[in-house]
Protein backbone atom coordinates (compact mmCIF):
# COMPACT_ATOMS: atom_id res chain seq x y z
CA UNK A 1 0.00 0.00 0.00
CA UNK A 2 1.32 3.43 -0.93
CA UNK A 3 1.94 5.71 2.02
CA UNK A 4 -0.45 8.33 0.68
CA UNK A 5 -3.24 5.70 0.69
CA UNK A 6 -2.68 4.48 4.24
CA UNK A 7 -5.78 5.36 6.27
CA UNK A 8 -5.38 7.54 9.33
CA UNK A 9 -7.61 7.59 12.37
CA UNK A 10 -6.81 9.49 15.55
CA UNK A 11 -6.01 7.25 18.52
CA UNK A 12 -8.98 7.14 20.89
CA UNK A 13 -7.32 7.89 24.23
CA UNK A 14 -10.10 6.60 26.49
CA UNK A 15 -10.51 3.34 24.56
CA UNK A 16 -6.76 2.67 24.31
CA UNK A 17 -6.16 3.55 27.96
CA UNK A 18 -8.86 1.10 29.04
CA UNK A 19 -7.32 -1.62 26.85
CA UNK A 20 -3.89 -1.12 28.45
CA UNK A 21 -5.38 -1.18 31.96
CA UNK A 22 -7.31 -4.39 31.23
CA UNK A 23 -4.25 -6.11 29.76
CA UNK A 24 -2.11 -5.07 32.74
CA UNK A 25 -4.67 -6.53 35.16
CA UNK A 26 -4.76 -9.79 33.21
CA UNK A 27 -0.95 -10.04 33.23
CA UNK A 28 -0.94 -9.74 37.02
CA UNK A 29 -3.62 -12.44 37.29
CA UNK A 30 -2.11 -14.84 34.70
CA UNK A 31 -1.82 -18.44 35.92
CA UNK A 32 0.76 -19.70 33.42
CA UNK A 33 3.39 -18.67 30.92
CA UNK A 34 1.14 -19.82 28.10
CA UNK A 35 -1.65 -17.55 29.30
CA UNK A 36 0.81 -14.68 29.63
CA UNK A 37 1.98 -15.23 26.05
CA UNK A 38 -1.60 -15.09 24.76
CA UNK A 39 -2.17 -11.81 26.62
CA UNK A 40 1.04 -10.41 25.16
CA UNK A 41 -0.18 -11.17 21.64
CA UNK A 42 -3.20 -8.97 22.38
CA UNK A 43 -0.91 -6.26 23.74
CA UNK A 44 1.03 -6.26 20.47
CA UNK A 45 -2.17 -5.57 18.53
CA UNK A 46 -3.23 -2.68 20.78
CA UNK A 47 0.27 -1.20 20.88
CA UNK A 48 0.93 -1.55 17.16
CA UNK A 49 -2.42 -0.05 16.20
CA UNK A 50 -1.73 2.92 18.47
CA UNK A 51 1.83 3.40 17.23
CA UNK A 52 0.91 3.14 13.54
CA UNK A 53 -1.67 5.92 13.88
CA UNK A 54 0.75 8.12 15.79
CA UNK A 55 3.57 7.43 13.32
CA UNK A 56 1.46 8.16 10.22
CA UNK A 57 0.40 11.45 11.77
CA UNK A 58 3.99 12.29 12.66
CA UNK A 59 5.35 11.55 9.17
CA UNK A 60 2.65 13.59 7.47
CA UNK A 61 3.18 16.47 9.88
CA UNK A 62 6.96 16.37 9.37
CA UNK A 63 6.50 16.38 5.60
CA UNK A 64 4.60 19.66 5.85
CA UNK A 65 4.69 21.35 9.24
CA UNK A 66 2.31 24.01 7.90
CA UNK A 67 -0.52 21.51 7.33
CA UNK A 68 -3.19 22.58 9.87
CA UNK A 69 -4.82 19.14 10.18
CA UNK A 70 -1.66 17.23 11.08
CA UNK A 71 -0.39 20.15 13.16
CA UNK A 72 -3.51 19.67 15.30
CA UNK A 73 -2.88 15.92 15.44
CA UNK A 74 0.71 16.58 16.56
CA UNK A 75 -0.58 18.80 19.35
CA UNK A 76 -3.03 16.06 20.36
CA UNK A 77 -0.27 13.44 20.62
CA UNK A 78 2.07 15.85 22.41
CA UNK A 79 -0.63 15.86 25.10
CA UNK A 80 -1.81 12.23 25.07
CA UNK A 81 1.36 10.27 24.19
CA UNK A 82 2.96 10.65 27.66
CA UNK A 83 -0.25 9.40 29.31
CA UNK A 84 -0.44 6.41 26.98
CA UNK A 85 3.28 5.76 27.45
CA UNK A 86 2.74 5.66 31.21
CA UNK A 87 -0.01 3.05 30.81
CA UNK A 88 2.09 0.98 28.39
CA UNK A 89 4.94 1.10 30.92
CA UNK A 90 2.57 -0.14 33.64
CA UNK A 91 1.88 -3.15 31.43
CA UNK A 92 5.60 -3.69 30.81
CA UNK A 93 6.32 -3.45 34.54
CA UNK A 94 3.72 -6.13 35.27
CA UNK A 95 5.25 -8.36 32.58
CA UNK A 96 8.78 -7.64 33.85
CA UNK A 97 7.82 -8.65 37.40
CA UNK A 98 5.74 -11.67 36.39
CA UNK A 99 6.64 -15.05 37.95
CA UNK A 100 6.49 -16.40 34.39
CA UNK A 101 9.14 -14.03 33.09
CA UNK A 102 11.57 -16.85 32.22
CA UNK A 103 8.92 -18.37 29.95
CA UNK A 104 8.45 -15.02 28.22
CA UNK A 105 12.22 -14.54 27.85
CA UNK A 106 12.25 -17.73 25.80
CA UNK A 107 9.49 -16.28 23.63
CA UNK A 108 10.62 -12.69 23.07
CA UNK A 109 14.27 -12.69 24.20
CA UNK A 110 16.21 -11.09 27.02
CA UNK A 111 16.88 -7.90 25.06
CA UNK A 112 13.16 -7.17 25.10
CA UNK A 113 13.25 -7.26 28.89
CA UNK A 114 16.32 -5.02 28.95
CA UNK A 115 14.30 -2.54 26.88
CA UNK A 116 11.41 -2.83 29.34
CA UNK A 117 13.81 -2.16 32.21
CA UNK A 118 14.89 1.08 30.52
CA UNK A 119 11.26 2.08 29.98
CA UNK A 120 10.43 1.42 33.63
CA UNK A 121 13.42 3.48 34.79
CA UNK A 122 12.48 6.44 32.58
CA UNK A 123 8.72 6.71 33.13
CA UNK A 124 6.58 7.67 36.09
CA UNK A 125 3.06 9.04 36.31
CA UNK A 126 4.36 12.02 38.29
CA UNK A 127 6.28 13.43 35.30
CA UNK A 128 3.50 13.23 32.69
CA UNK A 129 2.89 16.98 32.88
CA UNK A 130 6.59 17.70 32.34
CA UNK A 131 6.70 15.30 29.39
CA UNK A 132 3.73 17.06 27.81
CA UNK A 133 5.52 20.39 28.19
CA UNK A 134 8.71 18.87 26.73
CA UNK A 135 6.78 17.62 23.69
CA UNK A 136 5.24 21.06 23.12
CA UNK A 137 8.67 22.71 23.31
CA UNK A 138 10.29 20.30 20.84
CA UNK A 139 7.36 20.75 18.45
CA UNK A 140 7.76 24.52 18.73
CA UNK A 141 11.48 24.18 17.92
CA UNK A 142 10.93 21.91 14.91
CA UNK A 143 8.29 24.24 13.45
CA UNK A 144 10.58 27.22 13.94
CA UNK A 145 13.45 25.54 12.07
CA UNK A 146 11.23 24.08 9.33
CA UNK A 147 9.53 27.42 8.64
CA UNK A 148 12.75 29.34 7.93
CA UNK A 149 12.33 31.65 4.94
CA UNK A 150 15.66 33.06 3.77
CA UNK A 151 15.80 35.36 0.71
CA UNK A 152 18.82 34.41 -1.39
CA UNK A 153 19.78 34.44 -5.07
CA UNK A 154 16.37 35.63 -6.19
CA UNK A 155 14.40 32.98 -4.32
CA UNK A 156 13.20 32.20 -0.81
CA UNK A 157 15.04 29.22 0.68
CA UNK A 158 14.56 27.15 3.78
CA UNK A 159 17.66 25.74 5.51
CA UNK A 160 17.82 22.65 3.28
CA UNK A 161 17.45 24.58 0.03
CA UNK A 162 20.15 27.04 1.13
CA UNK A 163 22.68 24.25 1.67
CA UNK A 164 24.08 24.08 -1.92
CA UNK A 165 25.08 27.75 -1.63
CA UNK A 166 26.91 27.04 1.65
CA UNK A 167 29.24 24.57 -0.07
CA UNK A 168 29.53 26.05 -3.59
CA UNK A 169 32.85 26.71 -5.31
CA UNK A 170 32.52 30.53 -5.23
CA UNK A 171 33.87 31.66 -1.86
CA UNK A 172 32.14 35.04 -2.11
CA UNK A 173 28.77 33.34 -2.63
CA UNK A 174 29.52 30.99 0.27
CA UNK A 175 30.23 33.93 2.55
CA UNK A 176 26.98 35.62 1.50
CA UNK A 177 25.04 32.40 2.02
CA UNK A 178 26.52 31.87 5.48
CA UNK A 179 25.65 35.45 6.37
CA UNK A 180 22.05 34.90 5.27
CA UNK A 181 22.02 31.66 7.29
CA UNK A 182 23.37 33.40 10.39
CA UNK A 183 21.09 36.41 9.97
CA UNK A 184 18.06 34.13 10.03
CA UNK A 185 19.13 32.54 13.29
CA UNK A 186 19.72 35.96 14.81
CA UNK A 187 16.10 36.88 14.03
CA UNK A 188 14.87 33.88 16.06
CA UNK A 189 17.68 33.86 18.64
CA UNK A 190 15.50 35.00 21.53
CA UNK A 191 12.90 32.34 20.79
CA UNK A 192 15.55 29.62 20.45
CA UNK A 193 17.19 30.72 23.70
CA UNK A 194 13.84 30.57 25.47
CA UNK A 195 13.09 27.06 24.16
CA UNK A 196 16.56 25.83 25.14
CA UNK A 197 16.34 27.32 28.63
CA UNK A 198 12.91 25.80 29.23
CA UNK A 199 13.98 22.38 27.90
CA UNK A 200 17.04 22.24 30.17
CA UNK A 201 14.95 23.14 33.21
CA UNK A 202 12.17 20.76 32.19
CA UNK A 203 14.43 17.75 31.66
CA UNK A 204 16.35 18.45 34.85
CA UNK A 205 13.04 18.55 36.73
CA UNK A 206 12.03 15.22 35.18
CA UNK A 207 15.31 13.64 36.24
CA UNK A 208 15.05 14.99 39.79
CA UNK A 209 11.48 13.70 40.08
CA UNK A 210 12.73 10.25 39.01
CA UNK A 211 15.48 10.32 41.65
CA UNK A 212 18.45 11.05 39.37
CA UNK A 213 21.08 13.75 39.93
CA UNK A 214 20.57 15.19 36.44
CA UNK A 215 19.18 14.34 33.03
CA UNK A 216 22.20 12.30 31.90
CA UNK A 217 21.13 8.96 33.36
CA UNK A 218 17.48 9.49 32.46
CA UNK A 219 18.58 10.41 28.94
CA UNK A 220 20.53 7.16 28.65
CA UNK A 221 17.42 5.19 29.58
CA UNK A 222 15.27 7.23 27.18
CA UNK A 223 17.68 6.46 24.34
CA UNK A 224 17.50 2.79 25.33
CA UNK A 225 21.21 2.34 25.90
CA UNK A 226 21.09 -1.23 27.17
CA UNK A 227 24.55 -2.44 26.14
CA UNK A 228 26.87 0.38 27.24
CA UNK A 229 26.92 3.01 29.95
CA UNK A 230 28.28 6.43 30.88
CA UNK A 231 31.78 5.06 31.55
CA UNK A 232 31.95 3.60 28.03
CA UNK A 233 30.92 6.95 26.54
CA UNK A 234 33.51 8.80 28.64
CA UNK A 235 36.16 6.41 27.31
CA UNK A 236 34.94 6.99 23.75
CA UNK A 237 35.14 10.79 24.21
CA UNK A 238 38.69 10.41 25.50
CA UNK A 239 39.64 8.41 22.40
CA UNK A 240 38.03 11.04 20.15
CA UNK A 241 40.15 13.73 21.81
CA UNK A 242 43.38 11.74 21.76
CA UNK A 243 43.08 9.98 18.39
CA UNK A 244 40.42 11.47 16.15
CA UNK A 245 40.95 15.21 16.77
CA UNK A 246 44.67 15.11 15.76
CA UNK A 247 43.72 13.00 12.73
CA UNK A 248 40.98 15.47 11.76
CA UNK A 249 43.44 18.35 12.10
CA UNK A 250 45.78 16.64 9.62
CA UNK A 251 42.91 16.05 7.19
CA UNK A 252 41.79 19.69 7.42
CA UNK A 253 45.36 20.85 6.80
CA UNK A 254 45.47 18.77 3.62
CA UNK A 255 42.14 20.32 2.62
CA UNK A 256 43.43 23.86 3.35
CA UNK A 257 46.40 23.33 1.05
CA UNK A 258 44.21 21.82 -1.66
CA UNK A 259 41.89 24.85 -1.51
CA UNK A 260 44.87 27.22 -1.65
CA UNK A 261 43.82 29.11 1.48
CA UNK A 262 46.00 30.76 4.08
CA UNK A 263 43.51 29.80 6.79
CA UNK A 264 40.31 27.76 6.85
CA UNK A 265 37.12 29.56 7.84
CA UNK A 266 33.67 28.31 8.79
CA UNK A 267 32.57 29.27 5.27
CA UNK A 268 34.92 26.56 3.96
CA UNK A 269 33.24 23.82 5.96
CA UNK A 270 32.52 20.73 3.82
CA UNK A 271 34.26 22.24 0.78
CA UNK A 272 36.90 19.82 -0.51
CA UNK A 273 38.11 21.05 -3.90
CA UNK A 274 39.03 24.51 -5.20
CA UNK A 275 36.91 24.01 -8.29
CA UNK A 276 33.99 22.90 -6.11
CA UNK A 277 32.68 19.65 -4.73
CA UNK A 278 31.63 16.98 -7.23
CA UNK A 279 28.07 17.64 -8.37
CA UNK A 280 25.62 14.74 -8.51
CA UNK A 281 24.74 13.86 -12.10
CA UNK A 282 21.07 13.96 -13.04
CA UNK A 283 17.92 15.20 -11.40
CA UNK A 284 16.99 14.31 -7.84
CA UNK A 285 14.57 11.67 -9.15
CA UNK A 286 17.24 10.19 -11.44
CA UNK A 287 19.70 10.00 -8.53
CA UNK A 288 17.11 8.15 -6.43
CA UNK A 289 16.50 5.72 -9.30
CA UNK A 290 20.27 5.17 -9.62
CA UNK A 291 20.28 4.27 -5.93
CA UNK A 292 17.57 1.73 -6.63
CA UNK A 293 19.72 0.19 -9.38
CA UNK A 294 22.74 0.05 -7.07
CA UNK A 295 20.80 -1.70 -4.29
CA UNK A 296 19.37 -4.15 -6.83
CA UNK A 297 22.92 -5.12 -7.81
CA UNK A 298 24.08 -5.34 -4.19
CA UNK A 299 21.97 -8.33 -3.10
CA UNK A 300 18.51 -9.88 -3.53
CA UNK A 301 17.61 -8.69 -0.02
CA UNK A 302 18.51 -5.04 -0.62
CA UNK A 303 16.76 -5.16 -4.00
CA UNK A 304 13.55 -6.46 -2.38
CA UNK A 305 13.70 -3.82 0.36
CA UNK A 306 14.45 -0.85 -1.90
CA UNK A 307 11.91 -1.90 -4.54
CA UNK A 308 9.23 -2.21 -1.86
CA UNK A 309 10.05 1.27 -0.56
CA UNK A 310 9.93 2.77 -4.06
CA UNK A 311 6.76 0.98 -5.17
CA UNK A 312 4.89 2.10 -2.06
CA UNK A 313 6.29 5.65 -2.11
CA UNK A 314 7.86 5.25 1.32
CA UNK A 315 10.80 7.55 0.66
CA UNK A 316 10.50 11.28 1.29
CA UNK A 317 13.97 12.54 0.44
CA UNK A 318 13.45 15.73 -1.58
CA UNK A 319 13.77 19.15 0.01
CA UNK A 320 10.81 21.52 0.08
CA UNK A 321 9.50 24.39 2.14
CA UNK A 322 7.95 23.71 5.55
CA UNK A 323 9.42 20.20 5.67
CA UNK A 324 11.02 19.26 8.98
CA UNK A 325 14.82 19.43 8.95
CA UNK A 326 16.95 16.30 9.17
CA UNK A 327 15.96 12.75 8.40
CA UNK A 328 14.96 9.53 10.07
CA UNK A 329 13.76 5.99 9.54
CA UNK A 330 10.66 4.75 11.31
CA UNK A 331 8.44 1.68 11.34
CA UNK A 332 4.81 0.93 10.55
CA UNK A 333 3.95 -2.41 12.13
CA UNK A 334 0.80 -3.26 10.19
CA UNK A 335 2.04 -2.38 6.70
Regions found by a protein language model. Give the residues of each.
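Active-site-adjacent "gating/activation" loops or surface patches in catalytic cores
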Residues: 160-172, 282-335
Amino acid sequence: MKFKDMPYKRVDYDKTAEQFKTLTKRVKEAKSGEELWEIHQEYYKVYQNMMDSMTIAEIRHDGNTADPFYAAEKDYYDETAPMLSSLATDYQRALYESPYRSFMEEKIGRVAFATMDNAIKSMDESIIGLMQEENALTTQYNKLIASAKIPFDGQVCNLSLLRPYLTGNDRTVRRQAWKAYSDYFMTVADELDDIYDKLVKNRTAQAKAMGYDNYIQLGYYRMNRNSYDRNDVENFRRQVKEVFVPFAERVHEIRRKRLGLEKLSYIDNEVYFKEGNPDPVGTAQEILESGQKMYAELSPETKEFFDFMMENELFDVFGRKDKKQGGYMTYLYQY
